[in-house]
Amino acid sequence: MRRRKFLASLALGMALVATAGCGKTDAASKVIEVAVTPASPPNLFEENGETKGLDYDLFDGYCKDRGCKMNITAYDWQGMLGAVVSKKADVAFSGISITEPRQKVMDFSKPYMDNSWNLVSMKDRNIKLADLDTLKNYTIGFPRGMAYMDFIKTELEPKGIYKTDQVKLYPSYNEALTDLQNGQVDMVFLDGTVASVYRKKLPIQDSYVWEGIDRLGFAFPKGSELRADFDKYLDEIGPEKRQAIIDKWMK
């Protein structure tokens, strides 16, 4: 009997040691399924077959610290969010806005940066909106599943400023911007981070900007233990290191 108790205690002790050596959470000790949309520079994009970006650097730093590995799957924007809701993915990141409708079906990390929403147009069109009174005269495009649609539904449409049926939806920013250049759409909604990149590549300009209404975070399935540990990591590296990563990609 004593031998059985000893062996049971020994097994329990070994299990506790093994668990402690797995990382700071069970989730962090295994391969993490990551959903992304690799057409959202500078937050997430592909270059020469390699995944890069601000969000990637933040989560890569987490995995290096915790000893986990990422298995990255690319989706369109709506598919990426769907992978989190259905729990096919453990986390999603590509410059994702934290919104109330999304918080009902997924959990978010603490915000890691503030963001603006920019309506951009081609410079040769010279569309400049002093206010939103004339917005209804233009077609607007953006990727399916973006927070802009909720904004139009809850803020603009009830005030008679813009209707959701005027919107043209696309798989990603790439297709929306192609139609913008071809004159198939008047303006495209871009995150401020994304707009900062495409201004260097395309002759676009801001037609209207919403400041202070958006914060970006990492998306997790409801009840995720990984989210809490990632938040802990963000606290551990502190605001200065987080800002250094942001500054690296926002140059």
Regions flagged by a language model, labelled:
Residues 94-105, 153-154, 178-212:
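A ligand-binding cleft/hinge motif common to bilobed small-molecule-binding domains
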Residues 25, 69-71, 147-168, 202-209, ...:
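Ligand-binding clefts/hinges and TM-proximal coupling segments of bilobed small-molecule sensing domains
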Residues 37-39, 114-121, 192-235, 251:
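Periplasmic-binding protein-like
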